[in-house]
């Protein structure tokens, strides 16, 4: 029974720490950019878009399609960085916890 109590305590600690990490991630800013930095997208640590900056030289009606492509590229760059950051944080958090194969945390 001591083992079960210890496991429950560890699970509670993990749950508390996960909530803390979620708040830390939400407070972080991660920016991604397209080629030459003409478009920069900044996400929070959970993947929400905080801002989009567009080089003024692109604000030409003829450049709409180019601008859209650059925004997509910048967003994808920032999202990949966020995903990697979340993976690293969760790895730190679960370092001592052995999860069953195929099981992952809710991130």
From Swiss-Prot:
GO MF term list: DNA binding
Keywords on record: Cytoplasm, DNA-binding
GO cellular component: bacterial nucleoid; cytosol
Pfam families xref list: YbaB_DNA_bd
Location within or outside the cell: Cytoplasm, Nucleoid
Entry annotated with the keyword NADP: no
InterPro entries for this protein: YbaB-like_sf, YbaB/EbfC
Keyword Chaperone: no
Family annotation (HAMAP family): DNA_YbaB_EbfC
Quaternary organization: Homodimer.
Similarity comment: family membership: Belongs to the YbaB/EbfC family.
Name the UniProt record assigns to this protein: Nucleoid-associated protein Rru_A3472
